[in-house]
Amino acid sequence: MVPIKLKGRTISRGCAEGEILISRDPISFLGSVDPKTGIVVEEKHSLAGKSIKGKVLVFPHGKGSTVGSYVMYQLKKNGAAPVAIINLETEPIVAVGAIISEIPLVDMLEKSPYESLKDGDVVQVNGSEGYIELIKPKGSKIEE
């Protein structure tokens, strides 16, 4: 397999590896995600009922209140946060939340993550150098 590596823009430094969870819907961390469990509680959201805990969360951008940054921090303190985030374009609420929570975040990839990635793929997000790398496609027989 030829490795897929996509360059992007660094928003929050750090490196993390995990399984992709994709949403085409924006996320408001205040009111849409339970800060204790990491479960998306917004009924009409595409991720309703799913946990973002330990995932590499892919979504277009954030929405809603500036308090969302502190909800992200609360998720991290509760062990319920995503391990990394990939956005199409990050806005200040999610950027601040990722930085204060030390969650690696990359956006503006050279190719849309919706074209390159799918739920269950394992990727590394390198927020320090501004890239993501597909480690293991979903269903791959590659041994870890």
From Swiss-Prot:
<keyword id="KW-0456">Lyase</keyword>
<dbReference type="InterPro" id="IPR012016">
    <property type="entry name" value="PMDh-S-like"/>
</dbReference>
<dbReference type="GO" id="GO:0019287">
    <property type="term" value="P:isopentenyl diphosphate biosynthetic process, mevalonate pathway"/>
</dbReference>
<comment type="subunit">
    <text>Heterodimer composed of a large subunit (PMDh-L) and a small subunit (PMDh-S).</text>
</comment>
<dbReference type="Pfam" id="PF01989">
    <property type="entry name" value="AcnX_swivel_put"/>
</dbReference>
<protein>
    <recommendedName>
        <fullName>Phosphomevalonate dehydratase small subunit</fullName>
        <ecNumber>4.2.1.182</ecNumber>
    </recommendedName>
</protein>
<dbReference type="GO" id="GO:0016836">
    <property type="term" value="F:hydro-lyase activity"/>
</dbReference>
<comment type="function">
    <text>Component of a hydro-lyase that catalyzes the dehydration of mevalonate 5-phosphate (MVA5P) to form trans-anhydromevalonate 5-phosphate (tAHMP). Involved in the archaeal mevalonate (MVA) pathway, which provides fundamental precursors for isoprenoid biosynthesis, such as isopentenyl diphosphate (IPP) and dimethylallyl diphosphate (DMAPP).</text>
</comment>
<keyword id="KW-0414">Isoprene biosynthesis</keyword>
<dbReference type="InterPro" id="IPR002840">
    <property type="entry name" value="PMDh-S-like_dom"/>
</dbReference>
<comment type="pathway">
    <text>Isoprenoid biosynthesis; isopentenyl diphosphate biosynthesis via mevalonate pathway.</text>
</comment>
<feature type="active site" description="Proton acceptor">
    <location>
        <position position="65"/>
    </location>
</feature>
<dbReference type="InterPro" id="IPR020794">
    <property type="entry name" value="PMDh_S"/>
</dbReference>
<comment type="similarity">
    <text>Belongs to the AcnX type II small subunit family.</text>
</comment>
